[in-house]
């Protein structure tokens, strides 16, 4: 039985969307895997963008290393892929109109070569029978990052219109005497929520400040909060900077990515990129019948839902920086358990939700996997 891991942290140093806690998340997870789960340091690959001696977390390098990790796994092995960095989402192509989240969720490598949920699905579907791959993604819009895997905890597999309807009905049940103005205000606020604008972010104002904020704590301590969300305009700006291409058209972003990066991925991933032509969203069948049909050996723990943002936290007094979800995981795993049993995937995600809610975060972690993994111990047995 082998235990292997690929840990990726991207801070995007020197850019307008720089983060502070992603690389720290990687080092904390590395320590956790070694001390709590018996991983050998030689079997952990680290990719960070703050140390040039490390393999740089470009789109191609991430895909290559994840391919290597999956190819090396045999029956009885436990594999871990941890990602901390920016995330984004784009409308699906015509071939993905049945995506139950209604969007293509992506992670954002340091070279802006997006890795989409279909690519994760294709790679994870190659995990061998009897081998288990656990993916932890502390990034915005990470709910549903592996396409077509069953949602066990979360609300990402609902179409936006269904989410609005559910939220309005729930609000009406709690406050049945709302006036007409308040009723329609609720509709507007819930529509904003489906676009990834949470209440806490709306409260912080618009523009750049819409994904930054501060929380005052006791003893003159302040948390500087920045979400791990890369606005499309910022993504385009960084893409132009990274590639030297100044004439990138937003409406042709998929074709542009294929042109810029299509030669880098493997043939299978090239196919995934070549399908990025049409940006229509189909609100039809959720494709639930396909869930569990593929990627049976992959488990995803997401930092938030597909329409939410994961927080990057900086403690001004101590200088500590971390992802809110990554911190929740570490705090929960390090706490003694009364029953002395190993924490399960379901328990970890459920407890992380409570942990974050108590601390004022709006993000809700999710669990995506086959039914048989829900109550299995986190990472390994």
From Swiss-Prot:
Signal peptide residue numbers: none
Record keywords: Autocatalytic cleavage, Hydrolase, Protease, S-nitrosylation, Thiol protease
Keyword Hydrolase: yes
Effect noted on mutating residue 140 to A: Loss of protease activity
GO molecular function: cysteine-type endopeptidase activity
Modification(s) after translation: Proteolytically processed; by an autocatalytic mechanism.
Gene Ontology terms: biological process: hydrogen peroxide-mediated programmed cell death; programmed cell death; proteolysis; response to hydrogen peroxide; response to oxidative stress; response to UV-C
Hydrolase is among the record's keywords: yes
Enzyme class: hydrolase
Reported pH dependence: Optimum pH is 7.5-8.5 with t-butoxycarbonyl-GRR-aminomethylcoumarin as substrate.
The family this protein is said to belong to: Belongs to the peptidase C14B family.
Record's protein name: Metacaspase-8
Annotated organism of origin: Arabidopsis thaliana (Mouse-ear cress)
């Amino acid at each position: 039985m082998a235990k292997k891991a690929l840990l990726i942290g991207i801070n995007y140093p020197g850019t307008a969307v720089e983060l502070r806690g992603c690389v720290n998340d990687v080092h904390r997870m590395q320590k956790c895997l070694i001390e709590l789960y018996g991983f050998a340091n030689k079997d952990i690959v680290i990719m960070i963008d703050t140390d040039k001696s490390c393999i740089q977390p470009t789109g191609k390098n991430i895909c290559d290393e994840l391919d290597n990790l999956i190819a090396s796994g045999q029956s009885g092995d436990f594999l871990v892929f941890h990602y901390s960095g920016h995330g984004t989402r784009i409308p699906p192509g015509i071939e993905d109109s049945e995506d139950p989240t209604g969007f293509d969720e992506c992670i954002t490598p340091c070279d802006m070569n997006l890795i989409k949920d279909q690519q994760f699905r294709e790679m994870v579907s190659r995990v061998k029978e009897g081998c288990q791959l656990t993916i932890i993604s502390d990034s915005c819009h990470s709910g549903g990052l592996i396409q077509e895997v069953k949602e066990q905890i979360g609300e990402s597999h609902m179409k936006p219109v269904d989410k609005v309807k559910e939220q309005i009905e729930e609000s009406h049940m709690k406050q049945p005497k709302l006036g007409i103005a308040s009723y329609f205000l609720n509709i507007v606020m819930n529509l904003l929520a489906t676009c990834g604008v949470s209440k806490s972010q709306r409260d912080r104002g618009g523009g750049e400040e819409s994904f930054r904020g501060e929380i005052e704590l006791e003893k003159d301590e302040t948390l500087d909060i920045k979400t791990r969300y890369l606005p499309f305009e910022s993504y385009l700006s960084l893409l132009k900077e990274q590639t030297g291409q100044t004439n990138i058209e937003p409406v042709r972003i998929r074709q542009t990515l294929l042109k810029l990066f299509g030669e880098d991925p493997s043939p299978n991933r090239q196919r995934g990129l070549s399908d990025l032509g049409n940006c229509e969203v189909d609100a039809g069948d959720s494709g639930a019948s396909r869930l569990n049909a593929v990627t049976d050996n992959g488990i995803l723990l997401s930092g938030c839902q597909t329409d939410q943002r994961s927080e990057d936290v900086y403690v001004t007094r101590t200088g500590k920086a971390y992802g809110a979800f990554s911190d929740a995981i570490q705090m929960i795993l390090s706490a003694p358990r009364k029953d002395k049993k190993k924490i399960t995937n379901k328990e970890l995600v459920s407890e992380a939700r409570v942990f974050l809610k108590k601390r004022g975060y709006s993000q809700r972690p999710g669990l995506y996997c086959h039914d048989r993994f829900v109550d299995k111990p986190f990472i390994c047995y």
